[in-house]
């Protein structure tokens, strides 16, 4: 009944038609109706109308906000986590496999939320970090193996150097001894040469004396000293005049030898082979 009265009453009001030419009513005109919510009067959409669409529209911004916040958290946490991992890597340089497993577990813990992110840049960043860490670990192992090999080579070369230095010291000592022995041998050789020369001179003089003694009728078996002493012995003997062997002997005479030595000689005036002149 109220609606019919309102319709009939509204059709006769000129001011109302002037204010609302398109039939749109104000909130004051609709205040007489019993609407449950004031938003219905003001033109809003109440909460009990299209609840599923409203909830769906409300959920999508929340999901996008969560993803963006998670991506921003991962992006913000990536430098910090990388710094922490680099610090741990520098502290555990040259460590065992336990340190590597610890760093990998730490990487898994810190990179877990980022791996769940839908942003491909974050996924690539995490994969690149893992790849760099693995490459660094392999490089450390190669460097450690190369360093151990170099240390073993250094030890071996040091041993060889010590052995060669000892051999060089022994060779120098032997060389010094050989030089000293060579000098001694040279002096001995010079002394022997002098002795040989003296012996040759003595042999030459002895041969000459023996030749002179042979010419004088002396036995050639006598040595030079005995040949030189024979005239002295013969000078002290008494010669018999009737002895045919001593009849031709006269007093000895001195002869000057080429070496400066003076010897005695006897003349054979009555010798059958002839006499020896001075």
Swiss-Prot record:
Residues 124-143 are annotated as: Basic motif. The keyword DNA-binding applies. One of its GO terms (molecular function) is DNA-binding transcription factor activity. Keywords: DNA-binding, Nucleus, Transcription, Transcription regulation. It is found in: Nucleus. Residues 150-164 are annotated as: Leucine-zipper. Pfam families: bZIP_1. InterPro entries: bZIP (IPR004827), bZIP_plant_GBF1 (IPR045314), bZIP_sf (IPR046347), RISBZ3/4/5 (IPR044168). GO terms for cellular component: nucleus. Residues 122-185 form the bZIP domain. Residues 85-119 are annotated as: Disordered. Probable transcription factor that binds to the DNA specific sequence 5'-TGAGTCA-3' found in seed storage protein gene promoters. This is bZIP transcription factor RISBZ4. It comes from Oryza sativa subsp. japonica.
């Amino acid at each position: 009944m109220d609606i019919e009265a309102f319709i009939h009453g509204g059709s006769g009001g000129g001011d109302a038609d002037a204010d609302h030419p398109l039939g749109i009513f104000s909130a004051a005109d609709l205040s007489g109706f019993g609407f449950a919510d004031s938003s219905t009067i003001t033109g809003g959409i109440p909460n009990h109308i299209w609840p599923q669409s409203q909830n769906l529209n409300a959920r999508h911004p929340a999901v996008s906000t969560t993803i963006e916040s998670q991506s921003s958290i991962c992006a913000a946490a990536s430098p910090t986590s990388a710094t922490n991992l680099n610090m741990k890597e520098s502290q555990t340089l040259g460590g065992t496999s336990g340190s590597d497993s610890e760093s990998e577990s730490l990487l898994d813990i810190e990179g877990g939320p980022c791996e769940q992110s839908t942003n491909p840049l974050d996924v690539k960043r995490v994969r690149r970090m893992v790849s760099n860490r693995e490459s660094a670990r392999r490089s450390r192992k190669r460097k450690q193996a190369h360093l151990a090999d170099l240390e073993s080579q250094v030890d071996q070369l040091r041993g060889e150097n010590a052995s060669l230095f000892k051999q060089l010291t022994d060779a120098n000592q032997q060389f010094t001894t050989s030089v000293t022995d060579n000098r001694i041998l040279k002096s001995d050789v010079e002394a022997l040469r002098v002795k040989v020369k003296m012996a040759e001179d003595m042999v030459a003089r002895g041969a000459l004396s023996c030749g002179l003694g042979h010419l004088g009728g002396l036995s050639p078996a006598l040595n030079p000293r005995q040949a030189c002493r024979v005239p002295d012995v013969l000078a002290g003997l008494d010669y018999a005049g009737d002895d045919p062997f001593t009849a031709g002997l006269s007093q000895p005479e001195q002869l000057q030898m080429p070496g400066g030595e003076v010897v005695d000689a006897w003349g054979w005036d009555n010798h059958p082979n002839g006499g020896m002149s001075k």
